[in-house]
Every structure is written in C-alpha cells, then in structure tokens.
C-alpha cells in the first residue's frame, strides 16, 4: 500500500527538479560549494557547455557519470512541478526558487585534502524564509502509522504461520481475517510454483467450514512403552533375508505402487459421496458450479516395461526405475503430456534390451566356437601325450625287467649268505643255552643250601625275630594313621581358606562405596573349591554382568529406592495409555499426596512403596523385590532397572550362601 502511493510520485519528479530541491536545501544549510571530488580519475573529463534560454552556460561531464546545471534564481520558466499529493502543507507555488548557481569546477581538484576551493562571494540577496508549516496532521500521521504497523503485523503473522504450525493455529483462530490471508498467500504460492495446475484438475466442490466443530485428540496419541518392542520386531523382520521383500523381485515393487495409486484414486472418488451423505443440510443450499471437464483428453496409461533378462541386475534395476516413473506418470492426471515421451523411452529401452540379448547371443556363439577349438587342440595334445606315455612306459618296462633280474640274483646271493649266518648263530645259541642251564642248576643248589641254613637260624632265633615283626607292624599302622590325619588337616585347611575367600567376597561387596568388579575374589573361590561341582554351579549361576561390573550394597539399594519412590509416586496416577495431559496431572497430584508410614495394607502404589521401604530397612531384599514386582503400568516400567539390580544382588547372596553351606558340609563329612 505504501509502495503504491510512492510509485506515482517517483515518476512525476524529474532529475532536474530533484537537483533543484537538493541544491536549495544545501543553500539553506550553508553547504553551498563544499563539493568533494575523488582523488583518482579513471578517464579524462571533457567539459561541455550547453547554452540555455537565458544565456547561462551549463557545464556537462563528458564521461556521462553525472550532469549538473545552474539556473538563475529569477528564471520564471523553470519551476518544480507540483506534488501529486493534495494533502501537502506547502503549495507547489510556495516552493522557494534555487539561488543563482556559480560556475562548477569541471577538472579534478589539486588541493591536498581533495576538496574544491569555495566559490567567490556574490551580492545575491538571501532567499525569503519558507512559510511556517501549518499545525495539524496528527490524526493523519497516526492513521498512516496504524495502517503501516497493522500491515507489518499481518505480514509477519502470515510469515510465521507458514513456518510454525503452532503459530498458524493461533493466527488463524484469534486474528480477524487471519485464516483468509494465510489461505490467500498459500494459494498464490501454489499458483506461482504450479502455474498449470488449474488447467489439469477439475474444480473441487467445497462445503462451508464447520466453525463449531471441536478438535479432539485420540487417547492413544501419547507415548507408549511398546515402541521399543515394535522397533525390535521391525529390525528382526528387516534383518531376515529369507523373508519376502523388495530384494526378492524387481516387479513386485511396481505392482505394489500401482495398487497404492489405484487405492488413492478410489478414496478420492468415494470422498464426495460420503461427504454428501454425512451432511444432509447442505442439500438445501444452491448447487455449486459443476466440475469442468479436463482441457486435455485422457491418455491411455503406459504399460510397464518388461525385458526378459533376469541374470543382469543392472538391467533389472534400470527396468524397475523406468516402471516406477511409468507408474507415477500413470497416476498423475496430467499424464497426457508425458505419454509420448515415456512411450519413446520405453521403445528405446526395449531396443536396448534386444541389443543386449543379441550381444549375449553373439558372445555365447563366439564362446562356443572358441570352446570347440580348444577342445580339438586338447584332444590332439592328449593323443600325442598318450603316445609319448606309451613309449616311455615300454622303455621303463624293459629297464625295470633288467633291474629286476639283477636284483633277484643279488637277493639270492644275500639269502644264501644269511642262511649260513643263521645256522652259525643257532649253533652258538644252543651251546650258550647248555652253559646257562648248568649255571642255573648251580644257582639253584646254592639257593637251596642258603634256605636250609636260614631255616635253621630262624628256628634258633625265633623269639627275637617275633618281637621285631610286631614292632614293624605297629610302625606301619602309625604311618597309616598319620597319613589319614594329614588328609583331614589338609581338608580342614582348604575349607577354612574357602570360607575366608567367601568372606572376602562378601566384605568387598558390603564395604565398597560404588559397585566394583569382584572377578579376582570369585577366581580365588573357584581355585580353592578344587573342582567341586556344587561350588562351580553356584558360581556359574551368577550373572556375568554382576561380577564384571559389580553390584550395589544394601545402603546404595535403599538410597536408590528412595529416589525411585519419588519418581514412582509422580507416575502412580498414570493410566497405561497416558498422554501429555495425564503426565502433567499425575505430576501435580503427586505433590499433594500424603506419604504413608509403617506397614500399610493395600494394593495401591503408596502402600507397596511403604511396605518395600520397611522391608529394605529390615534387610529383607527378597520380600522387597516381590513387593516392587507387583506394581503395574508406568510404575513397574520405572522400577525395572532397580528390580534388575536387586535380582543380581539376591543371586550373588544366594550363591555365596550355597558356597558357605557346602564348606560346612565338607567339615561335617571329615569328622
């Protein structure tokens, strides 16, 4: 609006008039003659003189950079044109005339500071003072400012509405004519981006907007704890390559897209009928303008491209892209513009497929010829090789026969010599055997003699030898008892060491300020158990996360439960499918709820938290975990991590108690 009011005034103002007004303002301000020139000139300046009607010479720059003119103050022929605005306070005739200008220096200045010398003083009388402006126009200025501010506010509101959905709702609902302005801007933007859209689509029948209809948000629009499960199922389904999907076929995607386009068309056709049935009141209104028929005739859809080349993934991918383009164009109502182009492209692709098939057949034929040539050469080489092998085999057979005969004669001679040596050795062995038998008989006689002597000596010393045998038996019994007691002592020592190792694990878990790993302590317990299956089973029942990262102590569990109880109370009033409003309401209600004390009975969240805290203070972690496990909904989801830590602590404690019990059983078995 402001631009439209300023544009006509720009056309009426001539350059000469503008320069006159500027020059008169310089004269009134005492700035006449203070002209600055550039210190450097790119081209020489050629001054010209233009005579006027009154004989005044007007200097003109030769490089057409700018033109200055000096007009006498008493010239009645040159006047500034009247302003197009009829509301101006100063009449066009009251504009002061510019004073007589002095000759302007046309050559570049040579002063040090780059400024021109002041013009010589003249005896021209000063111009008359301008008439005082009339007081008034305050309401006009206020109205102009109001219109300008309102326009800026509407422009900024429309711009923010196009960028922010929240501000769009506020602007269109609470600002007068805001919705119409936003719709107009969006329609103009759509027409600018799609100038031919109005020609291709039929006019849509629009009904009156229901101003009183409330906008509702469904109950299942909030957050849900099942999102992670759906994402995990989607990931598992996406990672399974054996399932049916886009990677199995290139044509199924095109069929699915074509089916989706047809479904959208069916919905669009069914939408007007449904709208007419649901709004019977509109039947009384005058009928709207009938839909116009499309300007262009409806073209027949282009058939999908089909090339019988299944072993070329590149061709299949290209065919899939072309079929996608054909499906999109067929779905568009303005497809008649692209039918010829797509048909030509389809024909080119079919020719390309035929050329690929022909090239493959030619390459296959050439490969078959090369294979036949190679096969013939191979058979010829094989026959030649067989002939050479037969010749070499015959030569080798003759040579082997000669070597065989020579070797047979050598073996016969060696066998004869060996027989002679064997006979000689057999004779020597028989002679040695006879000598050995004689020696054995002599030894047997000596042994018999010694036994007789020993029997006689034993009979004489029977009393003394009997006492020595009893002492030997007693010493053996003492040695056996000593060995048994040593094993008992070793077992007790191992049991004590196992008990000490278990106590070390328990103290490491109870005395640590933060959870820390206890792998070394478990390794010591396992080594001291010496392969005991009960101890090994107890250690293996502990979760690897527990002994690799550590478990919290009882004080840490209680402290963490107290922090958890605050969050659970905030979510205690939330339903399963809660939205943002439910979360806010539950948070505000948790601030005014009273905290119970003691052992309360009931299934509500506050009673369960009170009983759990009492059980934790008594050291009954198992019962406390059972109480927290009975929670439902968001309360159970919030306490899931705390329950996992408590389960790990219970597993470790149960395993340690089992190991201690096994150590006590060992002691009882030894006794």
From Swiss-Prot:
Cited InterPro entries: MIC60
UniProt source species: Coccidioides posadasii (strain C735)
Membrane-related topology note: Single-pass membrane protein
Record's signal peptide: none
Protein name: MICOS complex subunit MIC60
Keywords: Coiled coil, Membrane, Mitochondrion, Mitochondrion inner membrane, Transit peptide, Transmembrane, Transmembrane helix
Gene: MIC60
GO biological process: cristae formation
Spans within the Mitochondrial intermembrane topological domain: 163-671
Family: Belongs to the MICOS complex subunit Mic60 family.
């Amino acid at each position: 609006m402001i631009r439209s009011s300023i544009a006509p005034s720009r056309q009426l103002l001539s350059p000469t008039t503008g320069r006159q007004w500027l020059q008169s303002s310089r004269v009134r301000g005492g700035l006449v003659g203070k002209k600055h020139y550039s210190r450097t000139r790119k081209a020489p300046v050629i001054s010209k003189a233009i005579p006027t009607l009154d004989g005044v010479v007007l200097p003109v720059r030769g490089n057409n950079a700018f033109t200055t003119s000096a007009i006498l103050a008493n010239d009645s022929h040159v006047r500034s044109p009247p302003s197009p605005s009829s509301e101006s306070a100063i009449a066009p005739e009251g504009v002061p005339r510019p004073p007589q200008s002095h000759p302007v220096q046309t050559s570049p200045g040579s002063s040090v500071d780059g400024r021109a010398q002041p013009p010589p003083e003249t005896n021209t009388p000063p111009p008359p003072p301008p008439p005082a402006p009339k007081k008034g126009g305050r309401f006009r200025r206020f109205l102009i400012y109001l219109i300008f501010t309102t326009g800026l506010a509407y422009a900024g509101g429309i711009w923010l509405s196009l960028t922010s959905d929240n501000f769009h709702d506020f602007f269109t609902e609470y600002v007068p004519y805001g919705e119409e302005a936003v719709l107009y801007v969006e329609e103009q933007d759509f027409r600018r981006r799609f100038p031919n859209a109005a020609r291709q689509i039929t006019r849509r029948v629009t009904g009156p907007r229901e101003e009183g209809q409330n906008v509702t948000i469904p109950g299942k629009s909030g957050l849900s704890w099942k999102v992670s499960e759906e994402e995990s199922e989607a990931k598992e389904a996406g990672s399974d390559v054996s399932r049916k999907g886009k990677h199995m076929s290139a044509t199924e995607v095109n069929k699915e897209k074509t089916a989706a386009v047809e479904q959208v068309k069916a919905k669009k056709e069914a939408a007007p009928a449904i709208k007419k049935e649901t709004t019977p009141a509109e039947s009384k209104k005058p009928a709207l303008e009938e839909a116009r028929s499309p300007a262009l005739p409806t073209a027949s859809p282009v058939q999908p491209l089909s090339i019988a080349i299944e072993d070329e993934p590149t061709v299949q991918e290209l065919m899939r892209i072309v079929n996608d383009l054909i499906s999109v164009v067929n779905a568009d109502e303005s497809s008649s513009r692209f039918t010829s182009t797509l048909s030509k492209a389809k024909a080119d692709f079919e020719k390309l497929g035929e050329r690929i098939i022909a090239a493959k057949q030619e390459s296959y034929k050439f490969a078959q010829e090369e294979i036949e040539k190679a096969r013939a050469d191979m058979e010829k080489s094989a026959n030649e090789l067989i002939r050479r092998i037969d010749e070499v085999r015959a030569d080798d057979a003759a040579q082997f026969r000669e070597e065989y005969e020579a070797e047979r004669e050598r073996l016969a001679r060696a066998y004869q010599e060996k027989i002679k040596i064997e006979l000689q050795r057999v004779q020597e062995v028989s002679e040695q055997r006879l000598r050995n038998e004689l020696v054995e008989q002599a030894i047997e006689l000596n042994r018999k003699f010694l036994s007789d002597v020993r029997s006689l000596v034993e009979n004489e010393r029977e009393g003394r030898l009997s006492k020595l045998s009893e002492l030997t038996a007693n010493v053996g019994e003492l040695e056996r008892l000593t060995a048994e007691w040593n094993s008992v002592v070793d077992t007790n020592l191992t049991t004590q060491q196992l008990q000490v190792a278990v106590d070390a694990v328990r103290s490491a878990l109870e005395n640590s300020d933060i959870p820390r790993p206890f792998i070394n302590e478990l390794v010591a317990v396992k080594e001291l158990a010496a392969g005991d299956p009960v101890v090994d089973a107890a250690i293996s029942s502990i979760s690897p996360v527990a002994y690799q990262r550590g478990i919290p102590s009882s004080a840490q569990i209680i402290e963490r439960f107290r922090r958890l109880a605050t969050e659970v109370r905030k979510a205690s009033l939330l339903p399963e499918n809660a939205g943002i409003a439910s979360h806010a309401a539950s948070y505000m209600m948790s601030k005014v709820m009273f905290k119970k004390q003691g052992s309360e009975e009931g299934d509500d969240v506050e009673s369960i938290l009170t009983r759990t805290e009492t059980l934790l203070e008594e050291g009954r972690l198992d019962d406390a975990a059972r109480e927290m496990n009975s929670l439902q909904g968001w309360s159970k989801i919030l306490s899931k991590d705390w329950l996992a830590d408590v389960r790990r602590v219970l597993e470790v404690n149960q395993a340690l108690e089992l190991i201690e019990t096994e150590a006590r059983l060992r002691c009882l078995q030894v006794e």
